[in-house]
Structures are given as C-alpha cells and as structure tokens.
C-alpha cells in the first residue's frame, strides 16, 4: 500500500496533501477550520445538487417549488434546511478561519492570504445569489437593494444594473441567471480552494508561536486527521442541532411571504453573516461612499501584510495588539447587531461610530500598537 501511496501519480498528490504532509507539532484547534470549511463546501454542494433537481428558476413557480421540496419531496425539508443552515455554519467557520489568520499573522503568507480573500468574495457572492432563489419578499427586495448599489458607479452604473437584471427590474431573467451562477460558483470555489492549498503547501503551515517550525514537523496523518475528526464531530453536532431543532432561527420570517414588487417590507436586511458589511454600507449617507466602504470592509484584509509593523509574527506574546484585536472582534459583533436594526436613532450613530472604529483599529491602532511593542521590547 505504501508503494502505491507514494508512487501512484494521482494518489501521491493526495498523500503529500493529507497524509505525509509535514505539519508543525504545536498547531492548535484554531487550525481545524480549514478542513471544516472543506466539509461545509461538500455538504453545500451535495444538498444544493439535490435541491436543484426539484427547484424551478421561474418567478411564477420558484416559491412554490421550494414549498413543494419541503412538503412533498422525501426528506426535502431536511435537505432544504441543511442547505440554508449549512451556509450559516460555512460563514461561522469562515469568520473564525479569517480571525485565526489575523491573530496569528498568517497574512504574511501573501499568496495564500490573497487567494483566501478571493475565496471569501466568491462565497459571499454565492450566498447572496442563493438567498434570492426562494423568491420570498426578502429575496426579491434584497436582490433589488443590493444590485441597485451598482448604480452608484459613475457613468456606467445604471446600464450595469439593467444589464445584471436583464431588464428594468429584478424579474424572471434575474432569477434564472442567479440560479445559473449560484449553481456554477461552488465548483469554481472548489478549484480556488485547491489553489489556496497549493500556495499553503509551498510555505507550510504557520503555528501559534509564529516561529519557524521546520525543525519540528510531524506527519499530518494520524495526528491531525484524528484532531480534525473531533472538530468535524463538534461541527456536525452543532449543525444538526441547529437544523433539526431551530431551522428558522437564523432566517427571516418575511421570506415565507411570496415576492411582491408592489409591497416593500418595513425593514430590508440581508442574512446575518452580511449584517456587519451592511451596517458599514448604511453608516455613510452618500451612496457611492457607502458602496466603497462596503467593498473596503473586506478588501482591507489585503492590506494586512503591509500594515504589519511588529517584529513578531503572531499576537501570542503581544498584549497591546491583542487588546486591539479583541476590541475589533467586539466592534464586528456590534456592527452585526446594528445591521439588523431599523435606521433610526440611536442605531444610526452607533453604526457610524462602530464603522469608524473598524477601519481605525485595522489601519491605525494595530500598526501603532505593533511599533510600541517593538520599542518596549527593544526590537528595533
């Protein structure tokens, strides 16, 4: 078996990636999320495939087809709720994975990090288009509001929006193309994941100390396969509790009402995992400014390698920057909460303050804290 594992042209690629991969001996459970994201992607592709067998991407029948899946298809309700809540689990793992990358300075592996940012954008685009497909009230109005943001682009904005819509409003053409894109994107994401792993295996994994671990590597299997398996069990446990006991807790009740272009819901808001970005978008009164802030809220991650001022890679031994990091986490939770609130006092000012704090912490305070720590430790 060893000979096949190491010699076979196809199997040896898997061997070098998941079995004999030299891995730092001290990586913690925070390094589990890569494999958990892979599991989430597989779950989403499989459940999505079975949903696509019964779904119809037509404005007249889309809502009914989803109801039909839940009522008449064998275990259709389970497949539908696994797919909907699988997206939430996906984003929880994504945010924790990115948070780990920021905390332990993994952004210094620039190619892997940039690939991860592209993946994040791709997953967000996929989730947004998936939310439109059930053709409920929030699907329709969410699609209308978010696509309309492109009209803020000077000169070509309006033309671009109508081109994406395939008409003068969100209608049948929009739904059909969103379904097509929603179907193809996960496979593109899978390809990008392989590139992400390729870049990662060029440099090897980071570790909690941020030090070079070449002298202390162990094989991925059995040590980290068993460790990842524990993470898988915990994720599946949480996932099934969410799906079977509280399937609608993260959804919007408005989406159980069929889409009606003549009736605007009182509060249009996206799914919970977009609320932090939505809060940043809403905090700027100018339309174009809001759109730019929205894009920058994610794109700012690409600046992280260039904003790294410390002589140490991770935050493990850097209490000042650690404090800034956890304030940033709290700030993101505040933004997520505010994004789901109506646009009125005091939520407007809270959102604006939290948005300013978000960019200030990343661009100014964390780099400054890094320099202060260098001075304290005489690392200059």
Curated annotation (Swiss-Prot):
Binds 2 heme b groups non-covalently. One of its GO terms (cellular component) is respiratory chain complex III. CDD domains: cytochrome_b_C, Cytochrome_b_N. Heme b b566 binds at residues 97, 196. Its cofactor is heme b. A ubiquinone binds at residue 201. GO terms for molecular function: metal ion binding; ubiquinol-cytochrome-c reductase activity. Its main location: mitochondrion. The chain crosses the membrane at residues 33-53, 77-98, 113-133, 178-198, 226-246, 288-308, 320-340, 347-367. It is a multi-pass membrane protein. Keywords: Electron transport, Heme, Iron, Membrane, Metal-binding, Mitochondrion, Mitochondrion inner membrane, Respiratory chain, Transmembrane, Transmembrane helix, Transport, Ubiquinone. Coiled coil: none annotated. It comes from the Eukaryota. It is found in: Mitochondrion inner membrane. Pfam families: Cytochrom_B_C, Cytochrome_B. Component of the ubiquinol-cytochrome c reductase complex (complex III or cytochrome b-c1 complex) that is part of the mitochondrial respiratory chain. The b-c1 complex mediates electron transfer from ubiquinol to cytochrome c. Contributes to the generation of a proton gradient across the mitochondrial membrane that is then used for ATP synthesis. The cytochrome bc1 complex contains 11 subunits: 3 respiratory subunits (MT-CYB, CYC1 and UQCRFS1), 2 core proteins (UQCRC1 and UQCRC2) and 6 low-molecular weight proteins (UQCRH/QCR6, UQCRB/QCR7, UQCRQ/QCR8, UQCR10/QCR9, UQCR11/QCR10 and a cleavage product of UQCRFS1). This cytochrome bc1 complex then forms a dimer. PANTHER family: CYTOCHROME B. Belongs to the cytochrome b family. Heme 1 (or BL or b562) is low-potential and absorbs at about 562 nm, and heme 2 (or BH or b566) is high-potential and absorbs at about 566 nm. This is Cytochrome b. The lineage of its organism: Eukaryota, Metazoa, Chordata, Craniata, Vertebrata. The gene is MT-CYB.
């Amino acid at each position: 078996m060893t000979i096949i594992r190491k010699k076979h042209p196809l199997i040896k690629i898997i061997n070098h990636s998941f079995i004999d991969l030299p891995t730092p001996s001290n990586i913690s459970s925070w390094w589990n999320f890569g494999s958990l994201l892979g599991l989430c992607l597989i779950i989403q592709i499989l459940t999505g495939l079975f949903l696509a067998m019964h779904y119809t991407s037509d404005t007249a029948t889309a809502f009914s087809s989803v109801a039909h899946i839940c009522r008449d298809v064998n275990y259709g309700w389970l497949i539908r709720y696994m797919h909907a809540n699988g997206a939430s689990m996906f984003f929880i793992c994504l945010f924790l994975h990115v948070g780990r990358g920021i905390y332990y300075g993994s952004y210094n592996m620039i190619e892997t990090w940039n690939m991860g940012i592209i993946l994040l954008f791709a997953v967000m685009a996929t989730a947004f288009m998936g939310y439109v497909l059930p053709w409920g009230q929030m699907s329709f109005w969410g699609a209308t509001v978010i696509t309309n943001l492109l009209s803020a682009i000077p000169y070509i904005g309006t033309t671009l929006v109508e081109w994406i819509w395939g008409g003068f409003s969100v209608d049948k053409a929009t739904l059909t193309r969103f379904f097509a894109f929603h179907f193809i994107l996960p496979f593109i994401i899978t390809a990008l994941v392989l590139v992400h792993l390729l870049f990662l295996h060029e440099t090897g994994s980071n570790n909690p100390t941020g030090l070079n671990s070449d002298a202390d590597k162990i094989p991925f299997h059995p040590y980290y396969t068993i460790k990842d398996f524990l993470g898988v069990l915990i994720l599946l446990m949480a996932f099934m509790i969410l799906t079977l006991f509280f399937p609608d807790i993260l959804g919007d009740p408005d989406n159980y009402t069929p889409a009606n272009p003549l009736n605007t819901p009182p509060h249009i808001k996206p799914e919970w995992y977009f609320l932090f970005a939505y809060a940043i978008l809403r905090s700027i009164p100018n339309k174009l400014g809001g759109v730019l802030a929205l894009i920058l809220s994610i794109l700012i991650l690409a600046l992280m390698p260039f904003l790294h001022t410390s002589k140490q890679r991770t935050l493990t031994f850097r209490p000042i920057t650690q404090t800034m990091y956890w304030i940033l986490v709290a700030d993101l939770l505040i933004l997520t909460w505010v994004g789901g609130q109506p646009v009125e006092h005091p939520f407007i000012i809270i959102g604006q303050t939290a948005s300013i704090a978000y960019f200030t912490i990343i661009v100014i305070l964390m780099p400054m804290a890094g320099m202060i720590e260098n001075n304290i430790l005489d690392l200059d």
